[in-house]
């Protein structure tokens, strides 16, 4: 740190308690100056020789026949005044980055200019600022920090602007030419925090592009904003480095606990809004902030009541990176925001596809598939969803994003488990989102035994499961959503469902009279399966017998026998 010593006389200021100071001299004090709570007993001559303002104040006091002067608005307070007073006495004072702003403002207040005395305090401070402070990286940062408490004096004297110019100019230099010291000791961890560089993998003298981040992130948010704005507007700094600085600033200053966030909502609101304002403009091809970081900002913006425009900007940015999100990151209290994010993503994805001369979403698009899996996992984990929000969010995902419906099935099953009060029509609405033909064998087996699913869905699951098991050519045709044969198989599934439902209604008292007959069946799915394919094994073994005897046996008798066999299978 640079410093400057002024004066040559020994310091003879002494204190009488906490609030009284005086200059030891052979002459008695002839003026008393009250600066805030502290009283100074001093001498007029050294003060008047350096300060135009003191000349006026002493003159006004003498007209009122008093030797006391009260100063209530001294910038820098009594400490800055004391340094100025000692300079007037010629005593040794030391100026450095920590006190020079206050002393410069106090000297301006006291009008310690060249017309009062040649080589006065203001002149000497300006020389030190230009030749020492503004040439030093860390001193410029420190001075900029001190200017905040001395506004508007520091702003009017252009100390703030000159500090910002000094800091930003050094940020923009070629890292290879840096000779000054800087702070680089990143040990913060977490998905939204800058990971410490592997120093052992770097060459000894290589300086990273983001060497300046830690020092600048010590600034208060308003000064930080002004520095980053100048750096951005220059167009000479990589946007990735700027985004990294913003992430580090959030990690440095934003509280982790919800209680701290809400208790200091005003300051945290300013922080979030400023960071969002400074985020580099992105597109999907060139995005500089992780989705996890953006979603964290979105969650905080909700908690602290950030402006709606801030949320809109975050929604837009998150939608560009949604394929990188985790389910944990996406668990936002306001489901409507998630809906907007997904809707924006799908709209952007469609535009991209159209720009690439695709008329529809392309099956196999990795980004689209990732988002499809993400939304299904979100639907399964968010227990606060209503039926309408569940359905609406699920319907935002196009078919091409769900080649397999296992994730959607899991989400539907979880929702039914969490909401046992669902009516039949509501369950039907939920299950209408799912295509049972797109379930894997494992999910299909689970669904066939799932007591929460409507009967119609279980029948469809069993039907298409049997098709796959038989390796029927129809099964491969059913996988295509545009095949006319598929419609036939759907109709068959529907007919099987109606068949089971009609049989269930007609069963009525017969099943009641059969007593423990139901215990003979291992499961609900087994009973339904045998309804659809009654006597499957027997029919296979006796097909020739049935074929040869069909012309000899009366139709009514054959029907009765089949009916009895079916009745026993399900009772």
UniProtKB/Swiss-Prot annotation:
Induction: Induced, in an ARF5/MP-dependent manner, in the shoot apical meristem (SAM) after auxin treatment of the shoot apex.
Biased composition (Basic and acidic residues): 484-504
One Gene Ontology term from the biological process aspect of the record: regulation of auxin polar transport
Gene Ontology CC entries for this record: apical plasma membrane; cell periphery; cytoplasm; cytosol; late endosome; plasma membrane
Disulfide pattern: none
Keywords of this entry: Cell membrane, Cytoplasm, Endosome, Membrane, Phosphoprotein, Ubl conjugation pathway
Pathway named in the protein's UniProt entry: Protein modification; protein ubiquitination
Keyword Flavoprotein among UniProt keywords: no
Biased composition (Low complexity): 540-562
Tissue: Accumulates in organ primordia such as cotyledons, leaves and floral organs. Expressed mainly in the apical regions of embryos including cotyledon tips and the apical meristem. Induced by the transcription factor ARF5/MP at the periphery of inflorescence meristems. Highly expressed in primary root tips and radicles.
Main location: other
Subcellular location: Late endosome; Cell membrane; Cytoplasm, Cytosol
Phenotype upon gene inactivation: Seedlings with abnormal cotyledons and flowers. Reduced PIN1 levels in the plasma membrane of embryos from the heart stage specifically in the protodermal cell layer of cotyledon primordia. Lost basipetal PIN1 polarization, resulting in abnormal auxin accumulation all over the meristem surface as a result of the lack of an auxin sink. Plants missing NPY1/MAB4 and NPY3/MEL2 form pin-like inflorescences with several leaves and fertile flowers. Plants missing NPY1/MAB4 and NPY5/MEL1 form pin-like inflorescences with several leaves and sterile flowers.
Region (Disordered): 475-571
Cited function: May act as a substrate-specific adapter of an E3 ubiquitin-protein ligase complex (CUL3-RBX1-BTB) which mediates the ubiquitination and subsequent proteasomal degradation of target proteins. Coregulates with PID the auxin-mediated plant organogenesis. Regulates basipetal PIN proteins (e.g. PIN1) polarization to establish inward auxin transport from the L1 surface of incipient organ primordia; this process is essential for the progression of flower organs development. Recruited to the plasma membrane by PINs (e.g. PIN1 and PIN2) and, in concert with AGC kinases-mediated (e.g.
Record remark: domains: The BTB/POZ domain mediates the interaction with some component of ubiquitin ligase complexes.
Name this protein carries in UniProt: Phototropic-responsive NPH3 family protein NPY1
Protein species of origin: Arabidopsis thaliana
Gene: NPY1
């Amino acid at each position: 740190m640079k410093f400057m010593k002024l004066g040559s006389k020994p310091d003879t200021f002494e204190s009488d308690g906490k609030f009284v100071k005086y200059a030891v001299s052979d002459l008695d004090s002839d003026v008393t100056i009250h600066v805030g709570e502290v009283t100074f007993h001093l001498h007029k001559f050294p003060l008047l020789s350096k300060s135009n303002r003191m000349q006026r104040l002493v003159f006004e006091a003498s007209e009122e026949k008093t030797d006391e002067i009260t100063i209530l608005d001294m910038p820098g307070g009594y400490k800055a005044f004391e340094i100025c007073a000692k300079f007037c006495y010629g005593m040794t004072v030391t100026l450095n980055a920590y006190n020079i702003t206050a002393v410069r403002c106090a000297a301006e207040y006291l009008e310690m200019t060249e017309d009062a005395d040649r080589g006065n305090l203001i002149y000497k401070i300006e020389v030190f600022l230009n030749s020492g402070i503004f040439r030093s990286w860390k001193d410029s940062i420190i001075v900029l920090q001190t200017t905040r408490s001395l506004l508007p004096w520091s702003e009017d004297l252009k100390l703030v602007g000159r500090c910002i110019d000094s800091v930003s100019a050094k940020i923009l230099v070629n890292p290879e030419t840096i000779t000054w010291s800087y702070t680089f000791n990143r040990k913060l961890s977490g998905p939204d925090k800058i990971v410490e560089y592997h120093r052992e993998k770097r060459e000894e003298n290589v300086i990273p592009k983001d060497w300046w981040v830690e020092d600048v992130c010590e600034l208060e948010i308003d000064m930080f904003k002004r520095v980053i704005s100048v750096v951005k507007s220059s167009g000479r700094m990589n946007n990735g480095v700027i985004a990294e600085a913003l992430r580090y600033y959030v990690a440095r200053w934003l509280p982790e606990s919800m209680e701290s966030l809400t208790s200091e909502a005003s300051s945290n609101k300013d922080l979030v809004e400023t960071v969002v304002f400074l985020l580099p403009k992105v597109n999907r091809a060139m995005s500089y902030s992780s989705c996890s970081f953006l979603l964290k900002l979105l969650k905080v913006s909700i908690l602290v009541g950030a402006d709606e425009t801030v949320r809109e900007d975050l929604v837009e940015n998150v939608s560009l990176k949604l394929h990188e999100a985790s389910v944990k990151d996406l668990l936002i209290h306001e489901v409507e925001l998630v809906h907007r994010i997904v809707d924006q993503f799908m709209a952007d994805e469609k535009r991209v596809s159209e720009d690439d001369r695709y008329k529809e979403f392309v099956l196999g698009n990795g980004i689209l598939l990732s988002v499809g899996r993400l939304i299904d996992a979100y639907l399964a984990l968010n227990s606060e969803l209503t039926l309408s929000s569940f359905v609406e969010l699920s319907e935002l995902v196009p078919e091409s994003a769900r080649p397999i419906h296992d994730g959607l099935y899991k989400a539907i099953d979880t929702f039914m488990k969490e909401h046992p009060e669902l009516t039949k029509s509501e369950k039907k609405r939920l299950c209408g989102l799912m295509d049972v033909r797109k379930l894997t064998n494992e999910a299909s087996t689970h669904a066939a035994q799932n007591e929460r699913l409507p009967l119609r869905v279980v029948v469809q699951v069993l039907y298409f499961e049997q098709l796959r098991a038989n390796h029927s050519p129809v099964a491969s045709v059913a996988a295509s959503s545009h095949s006319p044969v598929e419609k036939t198989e759907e109709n068959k599934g529907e007919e099987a469902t109606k068949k089971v439902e009609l049989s269930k209604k007609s069963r009525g008292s017969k099943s009641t009279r059969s007593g423990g007959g139901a215990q003979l069946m291992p499961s609900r799915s087994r009973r339904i399966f045998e309804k659809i394919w009654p006597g499957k094994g027997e029919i296979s073994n006796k097909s020739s017998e049935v074929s040869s005897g069909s012309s000899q046996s009366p139709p009514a008798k054959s029907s009765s026998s089949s009916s009895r066999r079916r009745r026993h299978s399900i009772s």
